[in-house]
Amino acid sequence: MSKQNRGRLIVIEGLDRSGKSTQCQLLVDKLISQHEKAELFKFPDRTTAIGKKIDDYLKESVQLNDQVIHLLFSANRWETIQYIYEQINKGVTCILDRYAFSGIAFSAAKGLDWEWCKSPDRGLPRPDLVIFLNVDPRIAATRGQYGEERYEKIEMQEKVLKNFQRLQKEFREEGLEFITLDASSSLEDVHSQIVDLVSNVNIHETLDVL
């Protein structure tokens, strides 16, 4: 399939309560309003058997070894990826609310080896664009429902932020378009910036892999 016909693979990352999920939905709605084919994917996908186990972990209903939960997060992405490829080949732009970068950033924040954290997702498709919504963890902590899940603690989020900054540097050196936006701006302003970035992203004929 030519690059003119395939869909784009767009990832939006951010700290918890950064407004990421809202922006993902706004982007999908915008693309559809422009008569483009678009679909939203949220990771973790809590509807699958693996996703339900992750959901229990995040809600602190069960305890799991850090390595085990990291591999479950990765498996949750792998079990969806064939469908994402199929959609992209049909010309559907796929918007991902979190991806492998979150897996690395959060697990490494718990002290797991950096390269080990990256390894389970090697081979997943490389996005055409990654947008990181940057917000001060202390500001995010003031937003509604903060603290309901395991990782929603300021100290943890500060470590995750540093890891995202490291990921951006490493992947940009590999040629990935990885952009940071100030998520403390208004909802409308952030949305407008995201739409501009997505509209102007350069795509290759085929997706590379991580």
UniProtKB/Swiss-Prot annotation:
One of its GO terms (cellular component) is cytosol. It catalyses: dTMP + ATP = dTDP + ADP. GO terms for molecular function: ATP binding; dTMP kinase activity; nucleoside diphosphate kinase activity; UMP/dUMP kinase activity. Keywords: ATP-binding, Kinase, Nucleotide biosynthesis, Nucleotide-binding, Transferase. ATP binds at G14, L15, D16, R17, S18, G19, K20, S21. InterPro entries: P-loop_NTPase (IPR027417), Thymidylate_kin-like_dom (IPR039430), Thymidylate_kin_CS (IPR018095), Thymidylate_kinase (IPR018094). Pfam families: Thymidylate_kin (PF02223). Its EC number is 2.7.4.9. Pathway: Pyrimidine metabolism; dTTP biosynthesis. GO terms for biological process: dTDP biosynthetic process; dTTP biosynthetic process; dUDP biosynthetic process. It is an enzyme of class 2 (transferase). Catalyzes the conversion of dTMP to dTDP. Belongs to the thymidylate kinase family. HAMAP family: Thymidylate_kinase. This is Thymidylate kinase. It comes from Schizosaccharomyces pombe (strain 972 / ATCC 24843) (Fission yeast). The lineage of its organism: Eukaryota, Fungi, Dikarya, Ascomycota, Taphrinomycotina.
